[in-house]
């Protein structure tokens, strides 16, 4: 009789939840492992294929690649799922970290969050850099290093504070089973294994609340600022007084396209933050928001290096040369029409820096 009831419970109430949990594990592998590979390739291209005129801007790109690589690896090891339990934040970890300890899983969660936050600040910095170059300023490598350190200091402080805010795992598990008895997490005969949990007892505890605000609130002003600098950059590039050759004009269009694509990357962060906030306050709920929040954020470090390799000419050509090197195919020094005509003359109020900017970006 008990077995019949248990099988009925699994079939009717838990099969869907268990399927989504398993899908989350598969998605983590499908997103994080290719993301780590793409970022490793980008790091290699930055090291080997960065031209002299791009060395300052490459500091920001290297920031992206290093932190996105770390995010992919750490997220794969944690593969967290957030269960909103009243005002407690309970994370269930499906990744390999569960074989170490709940605290290590929580550290992975904190590290991933701080790395993602830093990447968003650097993305904003890269848009500001492009705008400054087009308006006649010349940020040096030292300037960008100082900016990177200043931006990272915020995320580092977040990590150092948040990592010591974890609550007792046994108490969190009790809260989880009390608030969500329908999941039967305390029944190992159903789940076949013990559930590894960590998190925060109260989302309104000072440190936890500050950490949540840092991860959710800045994404809105950051995205607005990105759109602002993207708009101003497009205005400059569309200035009719900038005289470009046909090849340069073609690359000018590609640059605007690249800016549009890159400006869309934070949308994943915005959507994930919105889902997190609405779930925390009970506006939405269920296994889909619980599983999808961090998988959406995992998409950011996967897409970012792909966009960079596609739209930054030296890295795109460098990768193609590596791929074609041993194929027996002819490898030209200049691939297609992606390189800007080096003899183009630009006469405008913005000077030749506009030409150099377009040449190194596309």
Swiss-Prot record:
InterPro entries linked: 7TM_GPCR_serpentine_rcpt_Srd, Nematode_rcpt-like_delta
Main localisation: membrane
Keyword Repeat: no
Parts of the chain that traverse the membrane: 27-47, 57-77, 104-124, 144-164, 209-229, 264-284, 292-312
Pfam annotation, one family: 7TM_GPCR_Srd
GO cellular component term, pick one: membrane
Subcellular location, record wording: Membrane
Keyword entries, A-Z: Membrane, Receptor, Transmembrane, Transmembrane helix
Membrane topology type: Multi-pass membrane protein
Family listed: Belongs to the nematode receptor-like protein srd family.
Summary of the function given for this chain in its UniProt record: Thought to be a chemosensory receptor.
Classification via PANTHER family: SERPENTINE RECEPTOR CLASS DELTA-2, SERPENTINE RECEPTOR, CLASS D DELTA
Protein name: Serpentine receptor class delta-2
Organism: Caenorhabditis elegans
